[in-house]
């Protein structure tokens, strides 16, 4: 398996001949330093493997965790055996080596198992299953799991949004196709409602729109201010729970300022204002909700209605408006 092959490189990345030649010129201190580095690399590898194993479903995570434990156990054993042999070549002896008397030098150096533990500092999990993981190991494992869980949630949310968007678009297409209509995409920059209306006005005039999206914002805000008594009840119902930020009139004025001077997303309040400003019938198609019509009193027989589409699941950030045009008359 690929991970095993990569992990075994921690144990030895040299050929036997190269390792033998290097060890002939290696001091005990250098060897011990190398051993510590090898153990540290194995610990890091264990953390990486556990992080990778924390992804996927619970069943997949359980299977991966068991595989990681087996792999780390094998690598730990292999690394320990290698280091024991190298220690023995430097005069160290095991405490269980057939009761052979230890010479003075060996007595001072201590038995191999003790030295290996001293070199390791903090052993990898497979080597000390009987002892509790250190706080740093627990923190690393916790961070790895939290990051993996976060990535999994993001994937699930993106998948959910994508699925909802596909369903919504399919329903909208089914509604528009028999009418010979289709959606003309509008930039999702916060001005989408006003840009969609601008696009419709341009299509109806056969040239440029008489109003830019910014003009339309200012017109909507001005009309709402002039007809405050008509819009205030709807505004309050939409902003219920914001009473701590000032009086109703103050909050309504702040809302109007945002409409005319920021990229705040538009809603039915602004559409209602625009239908009167422009004296146009506006119809909003949707794949998620019933179609909405505003300004029916302005509807005429010359097919001058403005047509938009409302998308609840277009983007992860929220709602969006597009322009609806004849199939053979798509414009930017």
Curated annotation (Swiss-Prot):
Residues 1-165 are annotated as: Disordered. The keyword Transcription regulation does not apply. Residues 181-327 form the OTU domain. It is an enzyme of class 3 (hydrolase). The keyword Coiled coil applies. Keywords: Coiled coil, Hydrolase, Protease, Thiol protease, Ubl conjugation pathway. One of its GO terms (cellular component) is cytosol. Disruption phenotype: Altered DNA methylation of root hair-related genes and altered phosphate (Pi)-responsive root traits. Abnormal responses upon Pi starvation leading to the formation of very short root hairs instead of increased lateral root formation and increased root hair length. On low-Pi media, altered H3K4 and H3K27 trimethylation levels at the transcriptional start site of a subset of genes encoding key players in Pi homeostasis thus leading to a reduced transcription of these genes. It catalyses: Thiol-dependent hydrolysis of ester, thioester, amide, peptide and isopeptide bonds formed by the C-terminal Gly of ubiquitin (a 76-residue protein attached to proteins as an intracellular targeting signal). InterPro entries: OTU_dom, Papain-like_cys_pep_sf, Peptidase_C85-like. Residues 133-142 have a biased composition (Basic residues). Residues 25-85, 138-158 form a coiled coil. The active site is at 189, 192 (nucleophile), 320. PROSITE patterns: OTU (PS50802). Hydrolase that can remove conjugated ubiquitin from proteins in vitro and may therefore play an important regulatory role at the level of protein turnover by preventing degradation. Inactive cysteine protease. Deubiquitinating enzyme which regulates gene expression by contributing to chromatin organization and DNA methylation patterns (e.g. H3K4me3 and H3K27me3). Involved in the interpretation of environmental information, probably by altering chromatin organization and maintaining redox homeostasis. Required for phosphate (Pi) homeostasis (e.g. Belongs to the peptidase C85 family. This is OVARIAN TUMOR DOMAIN-containing deubiquitinating enzyme 5. It comes from Arabidopsis thaliana (Mouse-ear cress).
């Amino acid at each position: 398996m690929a991970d095993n092959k990569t992990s075994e490189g921690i144990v030895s990345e040299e050929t036997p001949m190269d390792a033998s030649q290097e060890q002939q010129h290696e001091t005990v201190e250098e060897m011990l330093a190398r051993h510590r580095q090898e153990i540290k690399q194995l610990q890091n590898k264990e953390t990486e493997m556990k992080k990778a194993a924390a992804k996927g479903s619970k069943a997949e995570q359980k299977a991966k965790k068991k595989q990681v434990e087996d792999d780390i156990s094998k690598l730990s054993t292999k690394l320990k055996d290698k280091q024991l042999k190298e220690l023995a070549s430097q005069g160290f002896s095991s405490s269980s080596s057939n009761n052979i008397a230890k010479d003075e030098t060996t007595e001072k150096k201590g038995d191999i198992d003790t030295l290996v533990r001293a070199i390791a500092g903090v052993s990898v999990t497979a080597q000390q299953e009987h002892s509790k993981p250190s706080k740093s190991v627990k923190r690393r494992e916790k961070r790895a799991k939290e990051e993996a869980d976060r990535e999994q949630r993001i994937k699930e949310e993106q998948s959910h949004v994508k699925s909802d968007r596909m369903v919504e678009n399919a329903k909208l297409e089914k509604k528009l196709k028999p009418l010979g209509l289709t959606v003309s995409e509008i930039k999702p920059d916060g001005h989408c409602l006003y840009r969609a209306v601008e696009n419709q006005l341009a299509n109806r005039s056969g040239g440029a729109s008489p109003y830019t999206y910014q003009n339309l914002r200012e017109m909507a805000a001005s009309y709402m201010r002039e007809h405050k008594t008509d819009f205030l009840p709807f505004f309050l119902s939409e902003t219920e729970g914001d009473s701590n930020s000032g009086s109703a009139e103050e909050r309504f004025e702040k809302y109007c300022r945002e409409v005319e001077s920021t990229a705040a997303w538009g809603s039915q309040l602004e559409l209602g204002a625009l239908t009167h400003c422009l004296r146009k019938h506006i119809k909003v198609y949707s794949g998620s909700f019933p179609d909405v019509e505003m300004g029916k009193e302005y509807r005429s027989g010359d097919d001058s209605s403005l047509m938009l589409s409302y998308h609840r699941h277009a983007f992860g950030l929220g709602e969006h408006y597009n322009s609806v045009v004849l199939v053979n008359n798509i414009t930017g």
